[in-house]
Every structure is written in C-alpha cells, then in structure tokens.
Amino acid sequence: VITVNNYTGAAAQAVTLPAATVGTIVVHAQSDDSTGGTNTLTFTCAGNDVYRTGSKVESRAAGAVQTIDTSAANETILTYTPANAATNSLTHGTYLYFTCFEKGIWNFAYDLATGNTADTGAAAWS
C-alpha cells in the first residue's frame, strides 16, 4: 500500500496501520511541505500489533544535534511533530516505510530530508 499524503501540520492527522500480516508493506509518501503548524501526525498499530523493539527514528530540533529515538517493547504509536517552519525533515518527497516480516510486528524505515535547512521535526515512539 502506498499512501500519498499531503499532511502539512495545520491539522492533526491520525493513521491506523493495517493488521501486521507477513508480507504487508505500507509506504507514507509525503507530497506537501509540513510548514502549516505544529499538529501531530501519528501512526498507530492496529489491534495487538506493535513496532519492533529497537526500531529507530530520527528526531530534530532547530539548532540542536539530531537525536535517535529507539522503540521499547510493546510500543504502538509513532508520533511526528513538525515545527511551524519550512525546515522540517518530513517534507516533499520524503518517505516512511512500514514492513511486516513477522506476524503482529511492524518494522520501520525512513527517508527524511537531509539538507542543512531540514533541521526540525520531532519524532518519538510511545
């Protein structure tokens, strides 16, 4: 499943992933710039599904060194919070990948903006 999404941060957006069935792939293709506000974008696992323990996601704060958040056991939500600026790491042409290799468990990967000005956007597991 590839979802082209025009999330801008102007309104909160909640996405529930499909059931984590072996072979399922979900791609979030970001089609717009997330410069419209600071409302969150969340990806929640369905039912009893979880993110793989030890999954990594990059988080950035303006003027600060980027950090990596690591998922703990039984976490089910990935939250992205943009800055109200044109400097977010989730912008035109970036992708979030959710892949299932083991029933009930989502693996996560990402291709975020990497330029010098893409230095905002907080991401965290819960």
Feature names for model-found ranges:
Residues 68-74:
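Acidic/polar low-complexity surface segments
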